Regions:
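Conserved SAM-binding loop of SAM-dependent methyltransferases across substrates and taxa
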Residues: 7-18
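Conserved SAM-binding motif I beta-strand of class I
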Residues: 20-25
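Conserved SAM-binding loop
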Residues: 34-35
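Conserved SAM-binding strand-loop segment of SAM-dependent methyltransferases
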Residues: 42-54
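A short SAM/SAH-binding and catalytic strip from SAM-dependent methyltransferases
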Residues: 65-78
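A short glycine-rich, Lys/Arg-flanked "PGG" loop and its adjoining helix->strand segment in the class I
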Residues: 80-92
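Conserved class I S-adenosyl-L-methionine
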Residues: 95-137
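Rossmann-like AdoMet/SAM-dependent catalytic core
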Residues: 151-280
Length: 280
């Protein structure tokens, strides 16, 4: 079961391996493309449902081995409620795949956005128009070109730098709390948040037999112990687990930064996260 499948390309991959696919795509303009894509791989019979409903109104009594919700869940006002809703579609031992804009990692995108916004203000340019894209290319395209990516620079500019929905971030700790309430545990992530088994004897399977909440708690502590490595995308020596005080300070800073970029006043002063800057 996949919500918001767009053209259904990912679902086609699963269907090519024999999966029966149920798709929920509220943009009905995409339905012909979805059917066409399944016809191309000769798997139209594997497309068991193509619904025009939104996640909010979709109903089905069937349970699924795999539920996929990518690209929008964190932007919904009642995302906690809908997380529980999609969890209820899972069979026992089923897998839920989501993605989200991380409430800490987004700091670097926000800094780029605020640089672009200030440059636009100084030049009398609309932040969300094509002239803004031209300035963004001068600032960021060179570094962007070095990345392994699936979208072009204009798409990234539109989706991330100037998009108000980019401020709708989520945090691992909040997702794990929701997982506990649905008896789910974090199985894997990209990047890898759980490094608990990287530097110990491979037979020490620490999480075997534990409750979902215990596994999630263990994962969160591992995440804190490797926070700088995740944030800066490289291996760093972190002597101790990052404290809740530092995380809260950084969280407040990022939230205010996001609000000021997309909804607020650039002239308003934002206090620097001093305790976090100590780690830099």
């Amino acid at each position: 079961l996949e919500f918001g499948c767009n053209g259904g390309e990912n679902a086609c991959v699963l269907a090519s391996y024999g999966a029966n696919v149920y798709l929920v795509e509220p943009n009905k303009k995409m339905h012909d493309l979805i059917k066409s894509n399944f016809k191309k791989i000769k798997k139209l019979n594997n497309l068991k449902l193509l619904s025009k409903d939104s996640l909010e109104v979709f109903k089905n009594k069937k349970k699924f081995d795999l539920v996929v919700v990518e690209g929008f869940l964190n932007t919904l006002k009642k995302r906690n409620e809908y997380f529980k809703k999609i969890s209820n579609f899972l069979k026992p031992k089923g897998i839920l795949i989501i993605n989200y804009d991380d409430g800490y990692g987004v700091i670097f995108e926000f800094l780029k956005s605020i640089i672009l916004l200030k440059a636009c203000k100084l030049n009398g340019i609309n932040f969300r128009k094509n002239d803004s894209l031209k300035i963004a290319k001068k600032f960021f395209e060179k570094e962007f070109s070095k990345l392994n990516k699936s979208r072009n620079f204009p798409s990234w500019w539109k989706d991330q730098l100037v998009n108000p929905y980019a401020s709708k971030t989520w945090k691992l700790k909040d997702i794990l709390k929701l997982s506990n309430s649905s008896n789910l545990y974090m199985y894997s992530t990209s990047p890898i948040f759980d490094k608990s088994s990287h530097f110990q004897w491979y037979k020490n399977l620490t999480l075997i037999g534990k409750k979902a909440s215990d596994k999630n708690s263990y994962i969160l502590e591992s995440w804190k112990s490797n926070f700088l490595s995740f944030l800066f995308n490289k291996s760093l020596s972190q002597k101790k687990k990052i404290s809740n005080k530092v995380l809260i300070e950084l969280e407040v800073f990022v939230n205010k930064l996001g609000r000021n970029i997309f909804f607020g006043n650039l002239k308003k002063k934002i206090l620097k996260p001093k305790n976090f800057l100590y780690y830099l």
